[in-house]
Amino acid sequence: MREFIPEYLGRFYDELTPQEFYRAIFPKGELEERGKQEHGKYNAIAVELLPKEENSVNARRHIITDDLRLLDELLKSDNFIIISPITYAGRSRVAANARFIYAITVDLDGITEEHYLTDLFFQMKNGFIPEPTYIVFSGTGIHLYYQLEKPIPCFKNIVKQ
């Protein structure tokens, strides 16, 4: 783990809890309520990558509903978990099931020295690259989240395949 990254970010930014972060990405009322199927409401999907074992399932999907309650349980896991800023119909994270994109995420791995972060933030502050809405420490690098003003619909009738 690259300890200098959260230390560096902590000097310049306030930290959000996972619940605060995902509530900002998926505002209250955007996701389906737990136990209800609502027309026009969809869910986020968390994919938990499980330890590799022969002849076993290597991933588990979790449905994230509007109460975000499942986040607390997922945070207890030592497994790698992915939650994209996209809502889906159903349990599968495939393009055909994508319904709305709430943010664009850029994954920057390979940040091995603090001067890489310093250079990145210099470029942001001086307008060479856009400043993200959120910066997330991933454990091996950072994710830059650019939250959209309005979610982009992904329905088949309006998305060019």
Predicted feature locations:
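DNA replication initiation on ssDNA origins
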Residues: 1-103
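Active-site-flanking beta-strand signature of metal-NTP-handling nucleotidyl enzymes
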Residues: 101-108, 144
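Pocket-edge structural micro-motifs
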Residues: 85, 108, 137
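Conserved aromatic-histidine-acidic binding/catalytic patches
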Residues: 94-98, 136, 154-160
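Helical (often loop-to-helix) elements that flank the catalytic cores of nucleotide-handling enzymes
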Residues: 114-126, 148-161
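Short, conserved phosphate-binding/catalytic loop or strand-edge motifs used
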Residues: 135-150
